[in-house]
Amino acid sequence: MAETNRIQMIVFDWAGTTVDYGSSAPSEVFDRVFSQAGIHLTREEINRPMGMEKKAHIRELLSTPSGTEQWKARYGTTWTEEDVQKLYQTFEATLHDVVAEYSVPIPGVVETVRSLREQGLKIGSTTGYTSQMMEQVLPRASELGYEADCVVTPDITGASRPTPFMLYECMRRMNVYPPSTVVKVGDTVVDIQEGKNAGAWSVGILTGSNLLGLTQAEYEAMTPEELERRKQKAAERYMDAGADLVIDSIRDLPAAVSEINRRMAEKEAAAC
């Protein structure tokens, strides 16, 4: 019989959550690919759809007012699915060459995941990367001390975030149910939506996140006042997306899980 009154599994995102501080790899590759095509987007525009399957991300970038206008000005017509496919092929090839370099665990990840496992929690993961991309990420992350018990990519389920199907596949593989005993942890709006659409708990991370949009060097050089302002803005976006909790860094996750377990116990007691 499944345990229903405590968290059984944590499902992490990858880039910006457990590896690749600031989710720099996809952001920099999108910038490079679009610049080569003559389309110049801001970092904020590039990062906004982050967490989606990468071909869907390209469509979102082309659909921005800036992307649409620049494409028409440069090519004299609106973009097509053929254009999306060409951009995606370039993106995939470019990312494949560099993604292993960006697969270093974010500070605090290795120790925190070890602590969670010692508490008996299973560690799942979902990502906007394809299986082929993850073949470059997994060995490097493992070499540096981070592994998930299962890794689910959009090409496996045929659907990406914010749909819940990758998270459901994690649950199926790890034999964990109901969804209310799962916590989704991520660094983008679609991570939060994935968890809520699955009926799980959703937790947003600030430090190292795509939503905060800072490299580690930028984070460390920023004034405390400006950093706090940016964190507050990112936290509001998480909460607007339905986050149950927002934490400063992954080191705060064990305490967040304890808080969720407390809420679950209170709810069960109230129902008795």
Predicted features and spans:
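Structural motif
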Residues: 49, 126-128
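Ser/Thr-centric signal marking residues that sit
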Residues: 17, 127, 207
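N-terminal helical cap/lid subdomain that shapes the substrate entry/recognition surface
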Residues: 4-110, 114-119, 135
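Asp-based, Mg2+/Mn2+-dependent phosphohydrolase catalytic module
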Residues: 1-8, 110, 114-115, 130-272
